[in-house]
Amino acid sequence: YNIVDQIFIGQGVGYLGNAATNVAYPFSTICLAIALLVGIGSASRVSLCLGRKEPKAAAKAAGNGIVLMGIFGIIYLLVGETFLPLLLKAFGATTDVFPYAKQYARITLIGMPFLIVTNGMSNLIRADGKPKYSMVCMVVGAIINTILDPIFIFVCDWGIAGGGLATVIGQIFSFILALRYLWRFQTIHFEKESFLFDIKESLKICSMGISSSSNQIAVTVIQIIQYNSLTYYGALTKY
């Protein structure tokens, strides 16, 4: 999503638009860290339970994982929208870039819960033996974003807001495809009880996904340091 947005926003808005999407990008990488935490954690739990011939426990692990994705997604959206100005400045937004970054991030944050569920579900779908369907979920959203970006940015003349809106719509389509798979699982058979929140199961899920999530968080920290370094040292030269 970010690469496509960079291309079209750069053409339609200019260098400030490109800078804004870069400054807002840590929101996406943090989002992916959350998705990895729950997605890989729940997929690992499902695989272990199925290996022990415990289908109900596997369904419970998957169900709790999906519930956690939704909870974390909503919390992340609320926190991001509430502290957006402070976070953008922490990410390295300058005075010139800030209005563009705020406009773009305000819209793309709406899609973060959908992105968390989609990326988290893709791990469960792969664990169910359907990697192609998982790939389709991701590719469809990217294609829709690529189609809508030039329409919203150039035809509708919505600028950077159009790029953000195209991203969110693409993420919603991916989310719908991922959610449809709930009724297509082959190794897991869900019941209502599968989606009852269980704190112990949730902790087990997070403990198994924390390693991959930590790696993604480290990438995010490096990005933020780089952006702030560019903001500071870039201002010291006329080039």
Would you name each region that the model predicts?
Residues 7, 11, 44, 85-86, ...:
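Transmembrane alpha-helix boundary and packing residues in multipass membrane permease domains
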Residues 46-111, 155-210:
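Short alpha-helical transmembrane segments in multi-pass integral membrane proteins
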Residues 1-19, 88-95, 151-158, 220-239:
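Helix-terminus/linker motif at the lipid-water interface of multi-pass membrane proteins
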Residues 30-33, 145-150, 175-179:
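Hydrophobic transmembrane alpha-helices of multi-pass small-molecule transporters
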Residues 93-98, 105-108, 112-139:
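Cytoplasmic helix-loop-helix junction between adjacent transmembrane helices
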Residues 18-77, 115-134, 227, 239:
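Small-residue-rich hydrophobic transmembrane alpha-helices
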Residues 1-5, 107, 118, 141, ...:
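Transmembrane helical elements of multi-pass membrane transporters/channels
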